[in-house]
Amino acid sequence: RVDRSTPWSLMASPIVISALDSIKVRKGVWEAIKDKPWMWYLEARMGAEVFQLHAVNGDDRDWYDQMLASQDDSLIPDEPCTAKATIYTACIAAGQIGKTVRQIVTGEKPPRLLIHDIVKGVITQIGG
């Protein structure tokens, strides 16, 4: 469990990656790390067949802070557990996260938000 009391030395990395199940927990992790000296924060979200990846540059944190503050678990439809555990979506998500890490380490700027709708076969990229 990561919160404000978690020593930064246990989390310290230039790239922090999270994949959490609720907005409440995402907000807790964000509060624990937002003022720390990381370079990138990658926050992954997955539904049955849709994957989202927020890529937060350490020099541009305000947009994510504002976006996350406006979200609440009660506003997000709950999917049945079996719909959340779609292995091919998780595999695609892992590949997209790996690609984003490669972009960062090779000096490319990844999109702020990547949404991959697997059913429709559509990848939407915002910012970057």
Predicted regions and their residues:
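Conserved SAM/SAH-binding loop
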Residues: 1-7
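Glycine-rich phosphate/adenylate-binding loop
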Residues: 8-128
